[in-house]
Curated annotation (Swiss-Prot):
<keyword id="KW-1133">Transmembrane helix</keyword>
<keyword id="KW-0961">Cell wall biogenesis/degradation</keyword>
<dbReference type="GO" id="GO:0050380">
    <property type="term" value="F:undecaprenyl-diphosphatase activity"/>
</dbReference>
<keyword id="KW-0133">Cell shape</keyword>
<protein>
    <recommendedName>
        <fullName>Undecaprenyl-diphosphatase</fullName>
        <ecNumber>3.6.1.27</ecNumber>
    </recommendedName>
</protein>
<keyword id="KW-0573">Peptidoglycan synthesis</keyword>
<dbReference type="GO" id="GO:0046677">
    <property type="term" value="P:response to antibiotic"/>
</dbReference>
<comment type="function">
    <text>Catalyzes the dephosphorylation of undecaprenyl diphosphate (UPP). Confers resistance to bacitracin.</text>
</comment>
<feature type="transmembrane region" description="Helical">
    <location>
        <begin position="115"/>
        <end position="135"/>
    </location>
</feature>
<keyword id="KW-0812">Transmembrane</keyword>
<keyword id="KW-1003">Cell membrane</keyword>
<feature type="transmembrane region" description="Helical">
    <location>
        <begin position="226"/>
        <end position="246"/>
    </location>
</feature>
<feature type="transmembrane region" description="Helical">
    <location>
        <begin position="260"/>
        <end position="280"/>
    </location>
</feature>
<keyword id="KW-0472">Membrane</keyword>
<keyword id="KW-0046">Antibiotic resistance</keyword>
<dbReference type="GO" id="GO:0071555">
    <property type="term" value="P:cell wall organization"/>
</dbReference>
<dbReference type="GO" id="GO:0008360">
    <property type="term" value="P:regulation of cell shape"/>
</dbReference>
Amino acid sequence: MTLLQALILAIVQGITEPFPVSSLGHAVLLPALLHWDLDEHAPMFLPFLTMLHVGTLVALAGVFWRDWMAILGGMFGRYGSYRQMEAIRIFGLLVIATIPAVLVGWLLEHRLRAVFGTPLAVAGFLILNGFLLMVTEWLRRQKGHRDHKPIATLAPKDAVIIGIWQCLALLPGLSRSGATMNGGLLRGLDHETAARFSLLMAQPIVLAATVREAWQMRHMTISHDIMVQCVAGAVVAGLTALICSLVMLRFFRNHDGWALTPFGVYCVLAGLFAGAVILL
């Protein structure tokens, strides 16, 4: 992998991690479409992947540091206060929503990616991701959801349902953030709140993936060239994810009636284009 390829992958990771368009799907399709000879299973690719996760994790933590301070500070605040009860409830909802994907991922993640990780399959799932985003918008309009329901008002059942939606992202091409936003919207959240809950959910999962990858490469010797790619990739992915997260939250705040639709259209068109190129 060249430095230019590393930077392009970092930019794509930073853009697609917060947006509901599947970061994993783009990571599979882009090298295939550009005919890059990359072996993502090579030992030297793991440090690069880990540092991309570190970059996006730091970016997301930077965007949502006030949320985490409110949650963690509230949990250890004055005993029995409303702020403490609300913080404990939100933290509990995040834990509940994370459990389904952790369990299913532990059992099936590698098998699903081995079976459905081909570029053509990913293109198909990217098209499906787009349709799911657009169908969710249509269903939400049919139900007349125009309220601004806070995260703390979700029931544990709502968190479980959002967590089940997240399991779809184990299929390459289906977006994790898109799936959880779909679940949040259908449980009564507005677009900005659904995105906020989705990206708060993402951070423990990205952290767990980073720790796992770091453990796997604990005995690895990393060359200077790979280290340069890793550091550059982390910085670029982090800055890109930071900007895109802020842009996305603002966009969702100002376009609550149809915010997922453009992403849905993009996924369908991108999937069709990628599938056509692969087949031809």
